[in-house]
Amino acid sequence: MRNRRKFHDFSPDVFMPSITIEHIAYVQIWLLDFSGFFCSFVANMDRKTFFENELLRCADVVSRGGVIAYPTDTVWGIGCDSSDSGSVEKVFAIKRRSDAKALISLVADEEMLEAVVGPLSAEIRELVRSDRPTTVIFEHPRGLAPEMLAADGSAAIRMTREPFSQQLCRRLGRPLGATSAKINGEPTPARFSDISGEILDAVDYVAGYGRDEAEPHAPSRIVKIAAGGELVFIRK
């Protein structure tokens, strides 16, 4: 019968090899790499959670007829439900302007845009897909509050690609009213820090996302679809 060595008969070196300084250094490097990855992972999760929470808060306020200040694909804006007359009138009151100058409606994608204005021509698709924010004035849109329309029944609509405003439109499932976050006649704020305290106090909620954006933004270009489908650039 073969002799079987008992567990305690083996030399400790079999199970506990010599640990060198190099081994310790490798472990330290690995731990540093892992801790850096873990911290980055947690930070990304925190940012994602913050983004989602702000979306939920803004969507809740807007869906209940409230008015928000929020980042858009151009300058910071005052927003509301484009289909709700009462909400639109609140925006006019905050900006101290009459309803003679209608608001812009933001949409999340081409599908939402076509639900409001009907099928898009190839030329219009090219415009709204442009990297540069482009507001298009459409004739006789559907589903918008009367206060969102100009005197001739047209409406200014822009497809946003900015993450927050785009996802907010999707959460609402309909266009989001937008106008610059300023009192009528005052300069347009290029950053959040440029918005007056009066505006921030007047809205029902101010989005926390995007406040630290340092780079200034400019207004969009504006294109009107004239009779016969001709495109007229109002602001380039």
PLM regions and their residue ranges:
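Basic polycationic patches enriched in arginine
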Residues: 2-5, 47
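Short hydrophobic alpha-helical segments enriched in small aliphatic residues
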Residues: 9, 14, 24-27
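Active-site-adjacent structural elements in enzyme catalytic cores
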Residues: 43-236
